[in-house]
Amino acid sequence: MPKKILFTGGGTVGHVTLNLILIPKFIKDGWEVHYIGDKNGIEHTEIEKSGLDVTFHAIATGKLRRYFSWQNLADVFKVALGLLQSLFIVAKLRPQALFSKGGFVSVPPVVAAKLLGKPVFIHESDRSMGLANKIAYKFATTMYTTFEQEDQLSKVKHLGAVTKVFKDANQMPESTQLEAVKEYFSRDLKTLLFIGGSAGAHVFNQFISDHPELKQRYNIINITGDPHLNELSSHLYRVDYVTDLYQPLIAMADLVVTRGGSNTLFELLAMAKLHLIVPLGKEASRGDQLENATYFEKRGYAKQLQEPDLTLHNFDQAMADLFEHQADYEATMLATKEIQSPDFFYDLLRADISSAIKEK
């Protein structure tokens, strides 16, 4: 019988990306892969879109909140139902291990796997753990982290960032679509790429719309998340969503303006791409992006600008400072030891799964 592994994680693309990097490697080595998630979540969409040979199991999901809300009462029952469903799935499949990338949907499968004696491996991308992974850590065999964590967390293995981006732009596939975009851009202007992510694109979209003079100073690429804004005109390319074009657009840009999500930041670090971070504040997140941005700035990888300070004057000042010290930022990024290849992590995870099985 083939070995089986269960994956879970969802809610945002960032909670699915690493799973989609690892899953093909397990499939290639003959593992039967299953995924537990929300049928209405981004994880289901991304798994279906990938075309990978993965069996998806839907469970009920409820949001975990640190504050009082009447919705908590309903969500308690959803989480309880999700746990019962997860127990049934794990008991039926009898996988060798479960790997979780976090998000609210991941807690019931993690708890179920632990209760049924299955090794549980989780991954934390941010500077500090979110509520879901704080709970999951109590049930985990091992937690891998992108950032160094507190010493008292005995089950932590500090890994660094796992990314599959091409460091060499020449490795990337050519794109006729990109060539068409370049025809609208000026070679005399710097090219800026705005990446807002699923939760933070609106502010960038509005900033660009409110300041048409930006097009006189820069070539602008704006990943909007909104198909109604799609546009290709002089010095401006607005597109709602990209897949194969994502890395080529980063390579094409002289500088990237991004939110503070860990996945994007470390992709930019791996490519040694000059970037300005405008993190989501605590009113829109739990503050993890602020921590990530401060970490990157202190390491000398990037500069940050708080969202309330995102004015045209402050933006121009930040651009001038970044381009003036571009060589220093790029040298610091090129010297980083914080990036790991997918193959390295896959081999480590496989070894840890084998060790956990032998110890049972």
Curated annotation (Swiss-Prot):
Domain of life: Bacteria
CDD domains: GT28_MurG (cd03785)
Substrates-to-products reaction catalysed: Mur2Ac(oyl-L-Ala-gamma-D-Glu-L-Lys-D-Ala-D-Ala)-di-trans,octa-cis-undecaprenyl diphosphate + UDP-N-acetyl-alpha-D-glucosamine = beta-D-GlcNAc-(1->4)-Mur2Ac(oyl-L-Ala-gamma-D-Glu-L-Lys-D-Ala-D-Ala)-di-trans,octa-cis-undecaprenyl diphosphate + UDP + H(+)
Membrane topology qualifier: Peripheral membrane protein
EC class name: transferase
Primary site of residence: membrane
TM spans (from-to): none
Pathway entry: Cell wall biogenesis; peptidoglycan biosynthesis
GO biological process, one term: cell division
Keywords noted in UniProt: Cell cycle, Cell division, Cell membrane, Cell shape, Cell wall biogenesis/degradation, Glycosyltransferase, Membrane, Peptidoglycan synthesis, Transferase
Cystine pairings recorded for this chain: none
Location of the protein in the cell: Cell membrane
Residues that hold UDP-N-acetyl-alpha-D-glucosamine according to the record: 198, 289
One CC-aspect GO term: plasma membrane
MF term (GO), any: undecaprenyldiphospho-muramoylpentapeptide beta-N-acetylglucosaminyltransferase activity
A Pfam family annotated for this UniProt entry: Glyco_transf_28
InterPro entries: GlcNAc_MurG, Glyco_trans_28_C, GlycoTrans_28_N
EC number: 2.4.1.227
PANTHER family given in the database record: UDP-N-ACETYLGLUCOSAMINE--N-ACETYLMURAMYL-(PENTAPEPTIDE) PYROPHOSPHORYL-UNDECAPRENOL N-ACETYLGLUCOSAMINE TRANSFERASE, UDP-N-ACETYLGLUCOSAMINE--N-ACETYLMURAMYL-(PENTAPEPTIDE) PYROPHOSPHORYL-UNDECAPRENOL N-ACETYLGLUCOSAMINE TRANSFERASE 1
Function: Cell wall formation. Catalyzes the transfer of a GlcNAc subunit on undecaprenyl-pyrophosphoryl-MurNAc-pentapeptide (lipid intermediate I) to form undecaprenyl-pyrophosphoryl-MurNAc-(pentapeptide)GlcNAc (lipid intermediate II).
Family: Belongs to the glycosyltransferase 28 family. MurG subfamily.
Protein name: UDP-N-acetylglucosamine--N-acetylmuramyl-(pentapeptide) pyrophosphoryl-undecaprenol N-acetylglucosamine transferase
Protein's organism: Streptococcus pyogenes serotype M2 (strain MGAS10270)
Upper classification of the organism: Bacteria, Bacillati, Bacillota, Bacilli, Lactobacillales
The gene coding this protein: murG
